[in-house]
């Protein structure tokens, strides 16, 4: 039976193979941090990429929604009937944003913050598990792991994890290696009744920010996990069964490198598209052009009149005129759902869809925008 270790681990985790992969991962992560700074309005990356991460992290748990449904829900289209799965994905995005708001200034990730993230994610205040009976099962419904059952033991391990997250004097090891250890420890403690996997992946994103490896929580680790789902769970269990920390840490470091590279490409594509839109909008809109209008079209894959009114502080008539002019010049597509009009940035949504995992990997068939509406 696996005994959850007290952190730091009493073994050398910086093997030759780990250090080699660590160098590659850190280089790629530093490049992503720099590329992200080329988008001057951080809310664009926060809003668009967090929605992507929310969708993909939820897909790891077989909570599936389409891009189309997710963007409609994000646009708060009242006439759109939101599915239970889409609500859960939107809640994930809200939980990640809430966590980022809580850690961005003091750069500390406490248990109270982790609990609040899970509370937003699951819409309950149950906190850490107090009742026994939680077991982790495989697809054949066989118990493969039993996490701590008593509340006191859970609190003991989580207090230790909190200190390990925030106190680098406990172990002189690179933050990315620590992140791999933290993620495994959180999964093994399994402190909540629900939402442990998704909360753990949010902790990953927030940890990269508090260690200043990224300024924004925009790394796509969930995409890598989806593509390597069976290996992900195999390696988590391999640590418990065989103490195979090296292979697990290598898996995480490779994930950081791979997903950082993919996110770099995505951010660059968004930047290029924004520049193209800026040039076209200056011609189309003339003196009516503003950075706020451009930013709005990239903050929300689906925008609406109310968003324009709010962001630009203009009247409803003016906001409607702006959007209709952009539609008539091919920069947006006007769509109607019930009594609501909304405006789709098709070029942006296409980029985001193309950067999602393949349909077979996340159990989702993504159809064209026109078919989904």
Please report, for each region that a protein language model flagged, where it lies by residue.
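FIC/Doc superfamily catalytic core
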Residues: 1-373
